[in-house]
Amino acid sequence: KLIEADQRHKKFGSSRFVIEPNVKEGKGGIRDIQTLIWISKFAYNSKNIFHLLESGVFLKKELYILSNSYKFLLSTRCYLHLLSKRENDNLDIESQIEISKLIRFRQKEFQRPVERFMKRYYIAAKNIGSLTRIFFSVIEDNFKKSIRFNFFFRNRINLEKPFIFKRKKIAIEEKSYILNKPEIIIEIFHISHFKNLEIHPETLRLLSDCSKLIRKKQVISKRSNKLFLEIISSDKNPRQILRLMNDTNVLGNFIPDFKKVIGLIQHDMYHHYTVDEHTFFAISNAYELKNE
């Protein structure tokens, strides 16, 4: 099922932030939730996603977010079918404008109703993408054959407290470390980027939960700013780690102005993705030019 999901994402667009997304088959779409439900039935014998609370896979707050995001995508798809008078899952620009009117999104400051509707859509898709990533990582951890931790691997890379290895992935030992020193939120992304280490799903959840802390304290942390600048100016393409920082809500809290462009669309012939996704592509292209 995971291989099928990867193939589907490649077919319908590897980014969930395309201007005209496929509501059902696209990344962060309805099919991703259905895949999660199918796998959970096999792995945990659950009847619906709310049974995953008992299994300890999701927190109550996460299931609430997942359920609301799923409902929003389902209602969007229903409106799309009604407008098209046929089965149609491609949320094109004309349909976006019409659906935003039907749902009665209003003008807010400089945001048009369609921009507000699509921002809500992209946030729902981002929530689904982030939470299904956690689910699939937990499944992988729980059901893969237990492999003895490679002693050579562990000694090749030295980690200092509060960072530890958990199934060959970097993790933070306890939440209290973040509460006392929020700058380690940026530090773990820095380590992940430069040492090619995946971040453990439980830690991704923790980072998302604590992301607002850096909004309050990052101004006085010169080290956080320094680490972030090292990431975006490094000899390794930073697009992937920046996306992960965005998915965990860290980037928008670390750079408050960036939060305003997350999920923001521009309906013109030059933009095929949301503004935040175009920003990641621009940084990636700058890296490619620098290394030609």
Predicted features along the sequence, with ranges:
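Non-catalytic interface/linker regions that flank or bridge core catalytic/transmembrane domains
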Residues: 1-271
